[in-house]
Amino acid sequence: MARIAGIDIPREKRVEIALTYIYGIGLTRSKLILSNTGVNPDIRVKDLSDSDVQKLRVAAEDFTVEGDLRRQEGMALKRLQDIGCVRGRRHRMSLPVRGQRTRTNARTRRGSRKTVAGRKK
């Protein structure tokens, strides 16, 4: 199994798809890496030569991927929360950040319903 950026990429998949298993590399960036390195995107990972795997490793190091990217995103959210802006407060309260309505929707973000007993008439 080829190991790139600390991730074992699946052997049976095409290289173009297998690279997307790395956090921070999508299909577009995968195609860019393959065109820069000159590796055929239709070949399977198990058929890659060691030199091809090494080329892909070096190319993937040019991008912020995996742990570094996760840390960067976490720090960006923490910064928003620390400065107390609206987006940071919404993140802290687990509410939608981008202006969506919350009266009837946003169940995913708010969690399951908390039933409130009705008042007797």
UniProtKB/Swiss-Prot annotation:
- Segments of skewed composition (Basic residues): 100-121
Question: A GO BP term, please?
Answer: translation
Alphabetized PROSITE patterns for the sequence: RIBOSOMAL_S13_1, RIBOSOMAL_S13_2
Q: Which SUPFAM superfamilies match?
A: S13-like H2TH domain
User: Is the tRNA-binding keyword given for this protein?
Assistant: yes
Disordered: region residues:
91-121
GO MF entry, a single one: rRNA binding
Report the domain of life of the source organism.
Bacteria
InterPro entries assigned to the protein according to its UniProt record, in alphabetical order? Rbsml_uS13_C (IPR027437), Ribosomal_uS13 (IPR001892), Ribosomal_uS13-like_H2TH (IPR010979), Ribosomal_uS13_bac-type (IPR019980), Ribosomal_uS13_CS (IPR018269)
Q: Which GO terms describe its cellular component?
A: cytosol; small ribosomal subunit
What keywords were assigned to this record? Ribonucleoprotein, Ribosomal protein, RNA-binding, rRNA-binding, tRNA-binding
State the function annotated in the UniProt record: Located at the top of the head of the 30S subunit, it contacts several helices of the 16S rRNA. In the 70S ribosome it contacts the 23S rRNA (bridge B1a) and protein L5 of the 50S subunit (bridge B1b), connecting the 2 subunits; these bridges are implicated in subunit movement. Contacts the tRNAs in the A and P-sites.
Q: How does it assemble?
A: Part of the 30S ribosomal subunit. Forms a loose heterodimer with protein S19. Forms two bridges to the 50S subunit in the 70S ribosome.
Which family would the database say this protein is a member of? Belongs to the universal ribosomal protein uS13 family.
Q: Which NCBIfam families match?
A: uS13_bact
The name of this protein is Small ribosomal subunit protein uS13
Organism lineage string: Bacteria, Bacillati, Cyanobacteriota, Cyanophyceae, Synechococcales
